[in-house]
Design a protein with these regions (language model features):
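Short, flexible helix/strand-to-coil boundary loops that buttress conserved ligand/catalytic motifs
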Residues: 30, 141, 153
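NUDIX/MutT-family hydrolases
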Residues: 102-112, 116-148
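Generic C-terminal helix-cap and adjacent flexible tail
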Residues: 154-161
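Active-site-adjacent beta-strand/loop module that shapes the phosphate/pyrophosphate-binding cleft
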Residues: 77-116, 130
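Acidic, metal-coordinating catalytic segment for phosphate/diphosphate chemistry
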Residues: 1-22, 96
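Residues embedded in well-ordered beta-strands
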Residues: 16-18, 25-26, 105-107
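Conserved Nudix-box catalytic region and its N-terminal flanking loop in Nudix hydrolases
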Residues: 21, 25-68, 74
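Hydrophobic (often cysteine-bearing) scaffold residues that line and stabilize catalytic clefts
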Residues: 11, 52, 145, 149
Length: 161
């Protein structure tokens, strides 16, 4: 059995998106690749040469199917937030290259209708979606993301009604 030296692994740079509807609820998707009842906000990697803000718009569109014109950027975390994944997941994710993710979070006001959302995208990440309150979302995510979500809501929560 190989023992992973987590201290030698880096964090994967990533963006996260808080999509907020007119009622102040947050878009959450149920992970398609997870057998548990794990929900999360959209997030994804930053491509080579891409700014975090550009990546956020692209990932939001890729994961929710909404057009850029249906989301208005209204805030961002001041810095980067990171989380570690459980050691047993490291070999399964990102070819075992990373210990977790280092994320810049962006808040978007959703300007569209629910019918504008289409999670049946080219490479779907979610099997279903829902609008959730902060508390509902915090109670339905994987435990290792709770702390980073709390930090996101500490910085951007004032944008959620």
């Amino acid at each position: 059995m190989n023992v992973i030296d987590v201290s030698k692994l880096k964090y994967r740079k990533n963006v996260g998106m808080v999509l907020i509807n007119a009622k102040g609820h947050i878009f959450a998707g149920k992970r398609i690749d997870n057998n548990t009842d794990a929900w999360q906000m959209p997030q994804g990697g930053i491509d080579e040469g891409e700014t975090p803000e550009t990546a956020a718009f692209r990932e939001l569109s890729e994961e929710t199917g909404i057009h850029f014109s249906r989301a208005r950027l209204i805030g961002a975390t001041a810095g980067w937030l990171s989380y570690d994944i459980p050691v047993e997941l490291i070999p399964q994710l990102w070819n075992g290259q990373f210990r977790g993710q280092k994320q810049k979070w962006f808040a978007f006001e959703f300007l569209g209708k629910d019918s504008d959302i289409n999670i049946a995208t080219e490479e779907p990440e979610f099997s279903e979606w829902a609008w959730k309150s902060k508390n509902d979302l915090l109670s339905s995510i994987v435990p290792f993301k709770v702390e980073v979500y709390q930090k996101v809501f500490l910085e951007l929560g004032h944008l959620v009604k």
